[in-house]
Each structure stands twice: as C-alpha cells, then as structure tokens.
Regions:
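Well-ordered beta-sheet/strand-loop patches within structured domains
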Residues: 1-229
C-alpha cells in the first residue's frame, strides 16, 4: 500500500489454459470437466518490495594487500544480507565474532593508537567505518562509535569507526518503522556498503568536516530534494 507502506504477504496462485479448457468444454458438451491447474509463485518477494531504495551508501578504496583484502572480504560477507527490523539493534563485534585464524582472518596492518602494526583481522576497521558512514546517511541511530586516534586515509576525516574485540564496538539501532538491509562487498579495489530500505524522506543528507588544530568537527546537513536547499 503506497499510503501506509504496508506489504500484503505474497501467496501462490493458480492458472490454467483458457483456450484449451474452452475447447474441451465444447467437445464434451458438459460443464463438468477436469482442467489441469498450474501453481504459480509470486514474481516479487516481500523482501524485494521492502529493499528497493538505497538509503545510505559508502564506497572507499582499499590498498592492494592480499591478507588485508581477505579480512575485508570476510567482514563484508558477515554483514551482507543482514536485516534489521524496526527497533532492532546491531553490534559489529557480535555480528563478526572474534577475529581468529580459524575463521580465516589474516595478520595485516592495523592501527594501534597512532602506529600501524600487523594484527589478526587488520583492515576490518575499514569495513566498520564504511558501514558507519553509510548508516549515518541512512539515519540509523548510532548507539556506540569510537574514531581512531589518528586520521585514516580511506574515509573522510572524523567519519571513521574503530573496532576492537572486547573493547570498542560499532552499535546502531533501526528506529524507523520499516526494516533495512545491509548489502556489503569488497571487490575491484573498493569496499561497498549500502543500507537498503524504503525511502520516505523528502531530503538528502550531506556530511562535511572541518579541521582545527588537532581536532576534527563533522557536520550533517539536510537538503530538500525538490529545491536542493
């Protein structure tokens, strides 16, 4: 329903060959006859209807480090297809779980304070940062987020999100009335994350930042889609 945004669940349907049934009826001269029915399934799923629009998108490039790329791919795989129902909370650490060698995570460069060191699962902060910024554009409610102690090269200043198993996490909640879904991949030199859902807003979001000495301030602006103001 375009007014209420309610989705009527799909159900199987039935079809038959009208011309064939009409011909049989004429040949038999009777209104009682057997007609083979074909069961048809809905061509559009409930999920297709709910997740037609991109509510938030972020697509930063990554460096050509095979071990780091493996970690990016594993993190994206854990996120891809995840659905947040209205009121549901999300935890990046809970979704990925502990980053272990048994799960395929590799030692790769990661920030420890302001220093780059090889760490198991190095690189997954690029995925959490990408998800964070996409979620800001989608206007999910950010419950927990910590930036790195040093500017990172792959995301605009002040818009990153570091994670560390057992310590820092990225958490958010879907406070809208409709479900959202994450689409995530690491391929062709880019981490791509979309927050999919049903667009109901009449404005666009723009994120900017300013640097003053050692500090970065971020700003979120809203612009009317019709006027751009």
């Amino acid at each position: 329903d375009k007014e209420t945004l309610e989705v009527t669940p799909g159900a199987p349907g039935y079809e038959f060959d009208v011309k064939d049934a009409t011909a049989k009826m004429r040949r038999q001269g009777s209104e009682d006859l057997r007609i083979p029915l074909t069961i048809t399934q809905p061509t559009v799923s409930d999920e297709d209807i709910y997740f037609q629009d991109v509510l938030g998108h972020c697509e930063p490039p990554y460096s050509n480090n095979p071990k780091r790329i493996t970690n990016l791919e594993l993190a994206c795989k854990a996120l891809d297809g995840l659905i947040l129902q209205p009121g549901e909370e999300f935890s990046y650490n809970d979704t990925l779980g502990e980053r272990t060698a048994e799960k395929g995570y590799q030692p790769a460069p990661a920030y420890s304070g302001t220093t780059l060191v090889d760490s198991l699962g190095g690189g997954i902060c690029q995925v959490s940062s990408t998800l964070y910024l996409a979620s800001v554009y989608a206007e999910l409610t950010i419950l927990e987020r910590v930036n790195h102690g040093y500017p990172v090269h792959y995301i605009p200043y002040g818009m990153d999100a570091t994670v560390n198993w057992g310590f820092t996490d990225l958490k958010m909640r879907n406070d809208s009335d409709l479900p959202v879904k994450f689409r995530a991949e690491a391929s062709d030199g880019y981490v791509r994350i979309d927050v999919l859902g049903t667009e109901t807003r009449d404005y666009d979001i723009q994120m900017t930042y300013s640097v003053g000495g050692r500090y970065v301030k971020t700003f979120k602006s809203k612009y009317d889609k019709a006027t751009g103001e």
